[in-house]
Each structure stands twice: as structure tokens, then as C-alpha cells.
Swiss-Prot record:
InterPro entries: Enolase, Enolase-like_C_sf, Enolase-like_N, Enolase_C, Enolase_CS, Enolase_N. It comes from Dictyostelium discoideum. Mg(2+) is required for catalysis and for stabilizing the dimer. This is Enolase A. The gene is enoA. It catalyses: (2R)-2-phosphoglycerate = phosphoenolpyruvate + H2O. Its cofactor is Mg(2+). The keyword Lipid biosynthesis does not apply. GO terms for cellular component: extracellular matrix; phosphopyruvate hydratase complex.
Length: 434
């Protein structure tokens, strides 16, 4: 049995150039010491109900975004409590850390402190059982493994890019691929066709990329973004095989009297502000005109009524991210209100592996879909690739097929696909059936 011997914690930079937490967890078994590393992501568009990401607030250092407080909590509070504990009991260690924090939102120790240790413990637990991480997660969750449909974010807008596009992500989902490797290739080929379309229409300056590797062209309307995707899919030869998804991140453009589709223009005249009802009509028009199969965060995180109306009126996947923040209580409310039909699973929104698994299983029990997700501020850590296979949720979004912190996850899925061989099961058209 491997037990925790010590923890090292450090401040590293994520893909947005901001500090985040990384830990090395040291274990001992039969006199042999091993180490397991984990790093925590962070978001740009964050829901107000997310667990607390503890930052230092010292403006003279990293503009207040340092994480030395979280690191101190790992070394001085969490480490003494977990030394000698078995890494094979993920739930017990997670509960211990949550109890040490004692707040409903992990505001004392920081979700970034707790999660870093939780992820490392999970890796150590897998090694203790001599199992690949994805297989270990499958066993502790009681789920069936399968390879996910990747949702590649290929056009960036909203808070992820400097253009005027209100909605945050325009994605492609290769649901018609026969396996993950083919889906990966389809995504890459559509991405490069999109690059050619954008550069031909807007010039070379337009193919700069956003935080998640997607292009950020100077387009003015959301419909224009959908047209570009449709054309790129056609040029790649994958019409009917590659579908479209959107993450609207509507909480980012919610204003007092509605939703401002021109929110990135300061002091605008308000002519682009529409009601939740009109915004719902816009989404229904998009669904009729384009091969859209998934829309995430179509409304503000507190606009339950608009969510419920849209979900009842369409047959596509409606995903709750800021609405649910991977929180069991918010998920329960969403199920009761029939506000959406899928969860976006972000481990740092809730702050531990055990709670993330619970959120996925609660969603599964409600016949919801579950899409595992990265954050815009990522690291080279590949945990979520193993998580999505182990849970078998059938769908993952972790950016474009571009930028190393995004490709680290996709490339890990290629390796897992290879390891599983003929035993793998690509979600494909059944991606919503978790």
C-alpha cells in the first residue's frame, strides 16, 4: 500500500501567462519513493458560483494573481493532514481536505490548492494499483470506458479573443468519424481549411489565434462565424460527418435589460441589446440553418426561465457550464427545472476528483450528457484526457488542434486509443448517451 510521504508545491504559469498551482506528491511503498505531479487550470469567463480560486491579491506581484497563499495552505495545512494516508482511498482524502477547508466554496484553502493535491493523489492511486489512470478512474467511478468525440474550438470570440464577436466559442464535432484518430484528423483538416478561408477573406492578419488555439478573425456577427465553419467543413469534404457546437458564454454579455450582442464595443448605443426570448429565437434560427448539435451557456447563469424554454423547444444538446459550475446543488436544481440536458464538467469548478465524479454520475442518472472540459488558462497536465475516457462521458472540449497545452490532451487520447486497441469504443453519434 502506497502512503503519502510529503508534498512539494510551486507557482508556475498557465497558458495565459498567469500563475497557477503545481504539486509533486511523494509516496512510499515497501521503501520505494515515487512522485506524482499535477497542475491546476483556471478560467477567463468564470461563473459566479464556482469554487474559489485563491489568489494573493498583492498588486505588486503578478498584478495580484499570485498563488502563494494557496501554496502555503498546501504545505502548512493539507500536507500535515494527509501524510501517512493511503493513496488508494481517493474519496477519504478528498473529504479530509474539504473538511479542513470547512467552507461551502473552498474559500479558505482554495479550490486550486485542494484540486492540485486531489489530482496528484488520483495519479498515485492508479500507480499503486498498477493501472493506467483512465482505467483506475473507470474503476473508482464504476463507469464503462470509451473514447470521446472531441469538440474543437476553432473560432474564438467573447472573453477569449480581441475581436467583436460576442459569443465565445464556435466548435466542430466529428461525430461521423469511425474512431478517435479519424476524428482528430477530421478536426485538423477542417481547422486548416478554415485557416485558408479566413486568410483569403480577411487577410493574413486575421489568422491570429485566441486563448484556446481557435482563430479570432475580425468578424462582426455570430452568424458570420457559423458561415465560416459551414464553408470550412464543406471544403474539407466532411459535410454531414462534422457538426457544429457553440459556447455562447452569455453571462459575459448579460446586461440589466437583456443581452448585449455588441458588449465588446465600449459605450455602444444599446441597439444590439435583446431580450432572453429574442435570444432564444436567434438560437432556434441558427439550429434550423446550420448543423448545430450542441449549445453551451446560451443564457445568463441565473436565467433559469430562458434555459428551460429553449431546452423544451429544441432536440439538440443544451449544456450548462456557468449555469451549473459542476456543483451538485446547481445540478440538482437544473434537473428539477429541466433547464438543460447536459453538464460541462470542469474539475476546477468544484475542486476535487471525488466531487467531479459525483457530478458526472448525478448527471448520468438524470439521462443528461456530460462534456469534460479544459479551461482557457491551461497547463501541460493531461488529467482530463484520462478522466473523459475513464468516465466514458463520450465528449471532451479542450481547444483547437493548435497550441501545445491543448494538444497535450488530444495527444494523450491518441495514446489511450492505441493502448485500448480493438477494445476501445468511440462515442461518435452516441456522444450524448453517457
Amino acid at each position: 500500500m502506497s502512503v503519502i510521504k510529503s508534498i512539494k508545491a510551486r507557482e508556475i504559469l498557465n497558458s495565459r501567462g498567469n500563475p497557477t498551482v503545481e504539486v509533486d506528491l511523494y509516496t512510499e511503498k515497501d521503501g520505494v519513493v515515487s512522485s506524482f505531479r499535477a497542475a491546476v487550470p483556471s478560467g477567463a469567463s468564470t461563473g459566479i458560483y464556482e469554487a474559489v480560486e485563491l489568489r494573493d491579491g498583492d498588486k505588486s506581484r503578478y498584478l495580484g494573481k499570485g498563488v502563494l497563499k494557496a501554496i502555503k495552505n498546501i504545505l502548512e495545512v493539507i500536507q500535515p493532514a494527509v501524510i501517512g494516508k493511503s493513496v488508494s482511498d481517493q474519496a477519504a482524502i478528498d473529504k479530509l481536505m474539504i473538511d479542513l477547508d470547512g467552507t461551502p466554496n473552498k474559500g479558505k484553502l482554495g479550490a486550486n490548492a485542494i484540486l492540485a493535491v486531489s489530482l496528484a493523489v488520483c495519479r498515485a492511486g492508479a500507480a499503486d494499483r498498477n493501472l493506467p489512470l483512465y482505467k483506475y478512474i473507470s474503476e473508482i467511478a464504476g463507469t464503462k470506458m470509451r473514447l470521446p468525440v472531441p469538440a474543437f474550438n476553432v473560432i474564438n470570440g467573447g472573453s477569449h479573443a480581441g475581436n467583436k464577436l460576442a459569443m465565445q466559442e464556435f466548435m466542430i464535432l466529428p461525430v461521423g468519424a469511425k474512431d478517435f484518430n479519424e476524428a482528430y484528423r477530421m478536426g485538423s483538416e477542417v481547422y486548416h481549411n478554415l485557416k485558408n478561408v479566413i486568410s483569403g477573406r480577411y487577410g493574413q492578419d486575421a489568422i491570429n489565434v485566441g486563448d484556446e488555439g481557435g482563430f479570432a478573425p475580425p468578424i462582426q456577427s455570430n452568424k458570420e462565424g457559423l458561415e465560416l465553419l459551414k464553408l470550412a467543413i464543406e471544403k474539407a469534404g466532411y459535410t454531414g460527418l462534422v457538426k457544429i457546437g457553440m459556447d455562447c458564454a452569455a453571462s459575459e454579455f448579460k446586461v440589466e435589460n437583456g443581452y448585449d450582442l455588441d458588449f465588446k464595443t465600449k459605450n455602444n448605443d444599446g441597439s444590439a441589446v435583446i431580450s432572453g426570448e429574442k435570444l432564444g429565437d436567434l438560437y432556434r434560427e441558427f439550429i434550423k440553418e446550420y448543423p448545430i448539435i450542441s449549445i453551451e451557456d446560451p443564457f445568463d447563469q441565473d436565467d433559469w426561465e430562458s434555459y428551460t424554454k429553449l431546452t423544451a423547444s429544441v432536440d439538440i444538446q443544451i449544456v450548462g457550464d456557468d449555469l451549473l459550475v459542476t456543483n451538485p446543488e446547481r445540478i440538482k436544481t437544473g434537473i428539477e427545472k429541466k433547464a438543460c440536458n447536459a453538464l460541462l464538467l470542469k474539475v476546477n469548478q468544484i475542486g476535487s476528483v471525488t466531487e467531479s465524479i459525483r457530478a458526472a454520475l448525478d448527471s448520468k442518472n438524470a439521462s443528461w450528457g456530460v462534456m469534460v472540459s479544459h479551461r482557457s488558462g491551461e497547463t501541460e497536465d493531461t488529467f482530463i484526457a484520462d478522466l473523459v475516457v475513464g468516465l466514458g462521458t463520450g465528449q471532451i472540449k479542450t481547444g483547437a488542434p493548435c497550441r501545445s497545452e491543448r494538444l497535450a490532451k488530444y495527444n494523450q487520447l491518441v495514446r489511450i486509443n492505441e493502448e485500448l486497441g480493438e477494445n476501445h469504443n468511440y462515442a461518435g453519434l452516441t456522444f450524448r448517451k453517457f
